[in-house]
Every structure is written in structure tokens, then in C-alpha cells.
Amino acid sequence: MVPSRAEAADILLDLDPPDWLLAHVGAVAEIATFLAERCAARGIAVDRELVEAAGLLHDIDKLLPEDDPVQELGHGAAGARWLGQRGYPELARAVAAHPITRLLDADRYGRWNGVATREERIVAYADKRAGQRLEAMSARFAGWAARYPEHRESLARARARAERLEREVCETAGVSPLAVRRLRWVGPALDAARRRRSAERPTAATRA
């Protein structure tokens, strides 16, 4: 089962995400939605709902307790397993495939690139274009290099693979990297989820 926008928003809010993570996953989801819509406009089949939900929930394991058993799987795979356990196995591949670590190792990247679905590629690319907002991939990699200076060489190799991914995704969508945009929907979906949760919360009068 693929969660709807409303269901994905509820899953995310259940884990009390901080504002910085909401900004990031919101940007990823909206960039991914834009790319899926552009593919669809060209008659190219893409599961838009899967792309939206995976984009919004791709970092879900960052919100789980450190002692949750799934954390042993590492970032991405942990979130995929957790979502699968809750009835959303369709999201697993796109969530597991998004981390930058997928691009660091040539053999691992080669295996993934040979079997990756269009939805996986879109979500993985959207993550490389979003920090707290839409940004150039060069800015995203500069941020990683600043945070992990000991991995500069491997990040440079990963960037070359990310540029290949960018070419593939953007060519499929029929846009240039400079033309990539966000298709806004996450803010309204989260606001609606918060209103629902507030309305469902028992008041002092109903508790009495």
C-alpha cells in the first residue's frame, strides 16, 4: 500500500519531526513531485503517489529511537524496514536508495543503477537538490564536503555519479537542471493533518 499525502503527513507528524527536517523532506517531496508530473506530461509512466510519499518519508529513520532494532541497518535501509513493518513495503526501495552513501562506492552504485526504478531515481535525485530548500547540486555537495572533510575524495567521485543521475532524470522529465522546481503541496498537507489531529484531541469537557 502507498500512503496518500494525508496519510504520509500523519506518519511523519506522529514522530514529532523538528522544523529543519520538515523543511528538508518537504523540499525533497515537492521537487520529486515536480519531476514526476513532468514525466507524466510526456507520457512516461511514474507512480506519482509513491514518489510523493517516499520523498516525504525518506528520512523517517532519523526520527526513530537510537535503540530501535531497525537502526542497525543504517540510514535509508532502516527507514525502509520500518515503513515495511507498518504496511508500506512499496516505499522501501525508494527510501532505501536515497542516501549519498549509495553513490560513494562504485560497485554498489553500479548494482543499484542497473535495477533502479524511475521512482527510485527521482527520489534519490530530489534529495541531492534539497538541503532546507531547492538548491543546485553543487551547493548540496559543498555542504557535505564541509561537514565531512575526511571524505572529500570519495564525495568528488559520488558527485560525478550524481551528475549522471541528474542527466538521466532531467532528460526523462524533459527539463534542464536549472528548470527544476518545487510543486507545492507539503505545507498544506501538514497543516491539514495538524488540524485533524487538533480536532480529534479530546477537550476537557469531553474527558469529563
Predicted regions and their residues:
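Divalent metal-dependent catalytic cores for phosphoryl transfer on phosphate-bearing substrates
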Residues: 13-14, 41-147
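A positional/architectural concept
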Residues: 27-30, 34, 64
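A short, charge-rich alpha-helical start-of-domain segment used by transcription regulators
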Residues: 20-23
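Residues within well-ordered alpha helices
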Residues: 11, 35-38, 82, 169
